[in-house]
């Protein structure tokens, strides 16, 4: 009799995805982040569910309900900080996952990559709306500033912003709908992640060399299941250390002040994982131009397959492209730092130069370097 694992309609799907899946024999730890993102998503949905049991999405009680969760609910403080810092871990894994894709040319799997870009936008939208829910000063003013950006859209902008707000300012209607969307989006993300995997399994995984690995495949289980478990243990170790020793390290102290529409904080800034995009937004003096640059800073990822001019897929054997890739990483760190600084000299000019370099590297320098490498290899 055939193994039930291979015949049962449900078990068969799991088997073909996580057990008998043929995987390249040489994929490194950079390929661990897909499973880590899955763990992060499950953790966020579970902790979020338990938080939603005690949270109230009303402007009068939202801040108090979060305080109540931390003070009165059994292990409420743990659930709340796991959720808040879990978001940070989620984004760390996301950035590393995308960086891996850029370095090793994984974007050549067009469908998988494009769904990944949509997933990135969805996670960013979810995180933004989640940050509004505790209804602290940064929640309120962050929501006001970011939603206001839509008013830069010609003709329909103002109406669009008021439609999203559900009034003439960020208020009760805004908070309620943000809670509703923040609750539903992770399930949409989970469904999209399933489609992401579906398309990945149509082609099989890429590998560090960028060469086809059809001649050398190994089963996913036990080789990569045990490797993923190690990755998961490290993720859990880092997250629990963060939550138990310095839960507010990555947060903003201003969010412990209840939202007050009459008092603007001196420096409005988003969570650390949005700072690079925020720096690009602020570096353009024009409102519409800034919004377009902000959107394009992420959307440019969708152009990566079109900008690939090299005859090789991976950067493993391309030293010039490697240098430019790490320059891009350094540039993103610079943008993240600038995004958290006040708008004054010398931060303004540093941010503008870093923003120009960001787009120059992706759109101009890296494609040229790839062509140069082709010529150097006489290809």
Curated annotation (Swiss-Prot):
It is a multi-pass membrane protein. The chain crosses the membrane at residues 33-53, 77-98, 113-133, 178-198, 226-246, 288-308, 320-340, 347-367. GO terms for cellular component: mitochondrial inner membrane; respiratory chain complex III. Gene3D superfamilies: Cytochrome Bc1 Complex, Chain C. InterPro entries: Cyt_b/b6_C, Cyt_b/b6_C_sf, Cyt_b/b6_N, Cytb/b6-like_sf, Cytochrome_b, Cytochrome_b_C_euk/bac, Cytochrome_b_N_euk/bac, Di-haem_cyt_TM. GO terms for biological process: mitochondrial electron transport, ubiquinol to cytochrome c. Heme b b566 binds at residues 97, 196. The cytochrome bc1 complex contains 11 subunits: 3 respiratory subunits (MT-CYB, CYC1 and UQCRFS1), 2 core proteins (UQCRC1 and UQCRC2) and 6 low-molecular weight proteins (UQCRH/QCR6, UQCRB/QCR7, UQCRQ/QCR8, UQCR10/QCR9, UQCR11/QCR10 and a cleavage product of UQCRFS1). This cytochrome bc1 complex then forms a dimer. Heme 1 (or BL or b562) is low-potential and absorbs at about 562 nm, and heme 2 (or BH or b566) is high-potential and absorbs at about 566 nm. This is Cytochrome b.
């Amino acid at each position: 009799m055939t193994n039930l694992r291979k015949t049962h309609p449900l078990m068969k799907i799991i088997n073909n995805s996580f057990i008998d899946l043929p995987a390249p024999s040489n994929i490194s730890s950079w390929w661990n982040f897909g499973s880590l993102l899955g763990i992060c998503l499950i953790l966020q949905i579970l902790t979020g569910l338990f938080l939603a049991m005690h949270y109230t999405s009303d402007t009068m009680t939202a801040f108090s309900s979060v305080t109540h969760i931390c003070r009165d609910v059994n292990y409420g403080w743990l659930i709340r900080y796991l959720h808040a810092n879990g978001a940070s871990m989620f984004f760390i894994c996301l950035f590393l996952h995308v960086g891996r894709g850029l370095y090793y040319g994984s974007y050549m799997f067009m469908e998988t990559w494009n769904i990944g870009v949509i997933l990135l936008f969805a996670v960013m939208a979810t995180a933004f709306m989640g940050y509004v829910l505790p209804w602290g000063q940064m929640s309120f003013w962050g929501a006001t500033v970011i939603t206001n950006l839509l008013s830069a859209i010609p003709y329909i902008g103002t109406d669009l912003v008021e439609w999203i707000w559900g009034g003439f300012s960020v208020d009760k209607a805004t908070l309620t709908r943000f809670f509703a969307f923040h609750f539903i989006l992770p399930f949409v993300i989970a469904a999209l992640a399933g489609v992401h995997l579906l398309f990945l399994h149509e082609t099989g995984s890429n590998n560090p060399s960028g060469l086809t690995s059809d001649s050398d495949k190994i089963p996913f289980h036990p080789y990569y299941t045990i490797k993923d478990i190690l990755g998961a243990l490290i993720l859990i170790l880092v997250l629990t250390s963060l939550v138990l020793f310095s839960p507010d390290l990555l947060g903003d102290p201003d969010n412990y002040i209840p939202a007050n529409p009459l008092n603007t904080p001196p420096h409005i800034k988003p969570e650390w994982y949005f700072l690079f995009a925020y720096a690009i937004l602020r570096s353009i003096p024009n409102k519409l131009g800034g919004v377009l640059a902000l959107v394009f800073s992420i959307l440019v990822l969708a152009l990566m397959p079109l900008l690939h001019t090299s005859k090789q897929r991976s950067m493993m054997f391309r030293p010039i492209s490697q240098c430019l890739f790490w320059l891009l990483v350094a540039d993103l760190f610079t943008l993240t730092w600038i995004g958290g600084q006040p708008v004054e000299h010398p931060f303004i000019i540093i941010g503008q130069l870093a923003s120009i370099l960001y787009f120059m590297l992706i759109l101009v320098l890296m494609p040229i370097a790839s062509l140069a490498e082709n010529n150097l290899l006489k290809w």
